[in-house]
Amino acid sequence: MTTADGKRRGVAIVTGASDGIGAELARVFAARGHDLALVARRADRLEALADEIVASGAETRPLVVALDLCEPGAIDALAKALDAAGARAEILVNNAGFGLVGRVDRLDPAEQFAMIELNVRALTALTLRFLPAIVAAQGAILNVASIAAFMPGPNFAIYYATKAFVLSFSEALTAELRPSRVKVSCLCPGPVETGFQARSGFALEGKMGAARLALISAAEVARQGYDGLMAGRRVVVPGLMNRLIILVAGHLPRGWLLPLMAAAMNGRPQPDGLSPAASSS
């Protein structure tokens, strides 16, 4: 992936690129002329996406790096893969993550710690590892959080808390890195029809009210996320309804908001107390 003069080619690293918002972000970045490094666990899906991007007219085939970001040494392995391909980090898209729905005392503790590991520690480690190269390139970082970052989430407690971390971390980075001319944006989508809901045990089928009205496609979320990043917007919330939800949540007393959020999550854990991981990794 080196350039004609032998220099390392700058790439946009997209984690959780195998499906959903991550795959759509990869498509948008490719369509806007960025070379890519696609990261997720499922090599077959990444290869298929890379083939699709080439078929759509990309000059350079995306680098495919299949790994689990929670495994020891995974980020070192990603850095080595970039180096071996003659690539360097210019943009980092931290999209990989997953959620679990249910009461915290009825969920598998190991799965809950794995959620923190991916949603918080891996995102932070990726940022710290590739930040020197991104600063040198005056590049950009897009962290994918959720409107969950703005409110507590009964029956989704740890997931919501991890997204609050992502938002706070991103906003602080925006200020810290402004002198370096590095753009940092936090993308905060609401409900999106992807595999997330089915695998988390929280499906939107049959639901009414704000959750349904706020529904937006993964492709539109990705487009707005990219445009917001390029425009230097600190926080990007796709959809008017999602922005209204955040506004209302920010003004309601917590004593009113908590039962409303519990009702929105149905107030019911899964029958066996365990929910499969909702993953974009």
Task: Show which residues each predicted segment covers.
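Conserved glycine-rich Rossmann-like NAD(P)H-binding loop of the short-chain dehydrogenase/reductase
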Residues: R32-L49
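Conserved NAD(P)H cofactor-binding loop of Rossmann-fold oxidoreductase domains
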Residues: N95-L100
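SDR active-site lid
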Residues: P179-N242, G255, D272-S281
